[in-house]
């Protein structure tokens, strides 16, 4: 059996913080796997990049009968099992180096349950769907095209779940707030668990050059009396603040209009 080869990422997927104009996007991984070949793609909803491939020498079936065929077939199954296990181990190693949020499997559906059996628990928890695709011949554009419906379905579900929590949370004594002023205030208090944003939402605001407090009104910071500085888009600064506090940021695309009714920005609170 050949030693699998792994390509390294050729584009800039690094750990640097996003520029203020960039909005966070969930990281996706697509694993294509056949009985003898595997390919790994990583990226986001807009673009995937092939980052690894694995090829193992798995013998093909033959038509001879008797004990010889049985032994040969058992050998093939063992080689396939080793290939799947090796692929899952390498995928998990990559995940540890460059984590992603969701995983999609692609290839023959009959291998899916075998792959799931060998996936690390952390990867199983991120598995959201399967696509039928030619593992060895598919272009990166086709992989993205097949994966996109799964990605969009996952986004719709997460947005629906967040909206349900928001609706429940904005009741009296609930754990959610809506509107830019309220959200910025709760960000300053570090009480936000999830920041919800309508795609494309921008708004002007103010920031404190000393403590970083964000607001939409005032001339001086209520915390340290520093003169507030105007910001063309305070929403980007809110996103940066959220990421610095390890807050989940969810961009609404499919249900954007529903969040726009709440001022295009909301927050689910820790307490």
Q: Regions from the language model: what does each represent?
A:
Residues 1-271:
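Terminal alpha-helical anchor/extension segments at protein ends
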């Amino acid at each position: 059996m050949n030693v699998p080869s792994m390509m390294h990422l050729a584009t800039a997927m690094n750990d640097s913080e996003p520029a203020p104009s960039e909005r966070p996007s969930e990281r996706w991984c697509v694993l294509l796997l056949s009985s003898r070949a595997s390919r790994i793609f990583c990226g986001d909803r807009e673009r995937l990049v092939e980052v690894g491939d694995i090829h193992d020498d798995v013998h093909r079936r033959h038509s001879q009968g008797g004990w010889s065929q049985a032994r040969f077939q058992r050998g093939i199954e063992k080689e396939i099992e080793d290939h799947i296990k090796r692929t899952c181990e390498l995928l998990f190693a990559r995940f540890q180096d460059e984590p992603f949020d969701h995983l999609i499997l692609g290839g023959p559906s009959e291998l899916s349950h075998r792959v799931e059996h060998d996936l690390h628990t952390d990867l199983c928890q991120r598995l959201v769907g399967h696509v039928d695709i030619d593992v060895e011949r598919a272009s990166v554009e086709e992989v993205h095209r097949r994966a996109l419906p799964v990605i969009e379905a996952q986004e719709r579900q997460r947005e629906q779940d967040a909206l349900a929590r928001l609706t429940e949370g904005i009741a009296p004594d609930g754990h959610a707030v809506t509107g830019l002023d309220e959200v910025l205030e709760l960000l300053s208090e570090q009480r936000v668990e999830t920041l919800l944003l309508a795609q494309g939402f921008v708004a002007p605001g103010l920031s404190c050059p000393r403590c970083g407090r964000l607001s939409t009104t005032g001339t001086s910071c209520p915390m340290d009396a520093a003169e507030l500085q105007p910001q063309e888009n305070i929403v980007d600064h809110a996103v940066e603040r959220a990421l610095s506090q390890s807050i989940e940021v969810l961009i609404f695309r499919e249900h954007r209009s529903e969040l726009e009714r709440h001022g295009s920005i909301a927050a689910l609170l820790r307490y």
